[in-house]
């Protein structure tokens, strides 16, 4: 470990309590995708306090802090921290105002880039850097609240439901040559990544006819029955999904009716259709649409299926030698173990980091 690396670690250790306090504040004020207004403001204020040039409003809530912008012609490196949380109302540390909780650890990502910013803005360290560093707080990695994101799309505020996809579309990565993304996990320190699923998202809306559920059900058109048949038809498609494609389709009913004694006249389903490659995503998506269409035809309800772009499949990433060496140097003399990622390992989950790699 050279003198600069030692000084970086010293700076982070010196500000340990401040970094942890920032993380805990974000943790207890979790916000959902494209709604991270408080989180965004906190990140902006912290980066400004360090004397960085800061810009905000990227993909609604994204924030960029620039170190050494005069050197961006050499290399421009982004350190990325995701801001959004998950809607988990029953979580012990849920934010009661948003019903969100940081179950995926994005608060730790933000603490990571804040800690890096504290260290790298040290004048003695900053002058050793050959390029620009961009501390980038990004929105909406978790792909929840599909209908809300569709509303933003219809309002012209976004085109893509995923934060990094939208940032790419806006050109927010045009001044960045490479990005470093990190995430909490089971291992002490894991460098590199395996592959992961991509997906499209869908909203299925069944429109029936209300009637008294006991007195005159024959006068109604039961949208919930149409949805139930659609879900059953989808279940019968599962044997056609090949294991090698790692297909995952997991719908939820977000609206199932209004009153127990009224035939449901509107039912809404949201789902992701995931797979390991684009051809498999297209195939599974077509089968999913046919299944939900069948439910509507069987019952005689109207229906509307909206399909939105999700994320591209995540590509494997070999452990970068420089990152690996830095991780090993930083953990030397500690109990932390540095491991190279198994690039052959596939995850059924998804991340919009995949869109950065394509």
Predicted regions and their residues:
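Short Gly/Pro-enriched turn/cap motifs at secondary-structure boundaries
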Residues: 55, 156-158, 193-196, 343-347
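Soluble non-cytosolic domains of exported or imported proteins
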Residues: 34-38, 158, 221
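Zn-dependent metallopeptidase/amidohydrolase metal-coordination segment
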Residues: 333-358
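Acidic/histidine-rich catalytic neighborhood of metal-dependent amide-processing enzymes
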Residues: 111-195
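Generic non-transmembrane alpha-helical segments
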Residues: 7, 11, 15, 22-25, ...
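Alpha-helical metal-binding/catalytic segments enriched in His/Glu/Asp
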Residues: 97-147, 200-206, 212-237, 271-273
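Acidic/His- and Gly-rich active-site-bordering loop/insert found
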Residues: 2-103, 107-134, 139
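Midchain, well-structured core segments that form catalytic/ion-binding scaffolds
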Residues: 168, 173-321, 325-326, 346-354
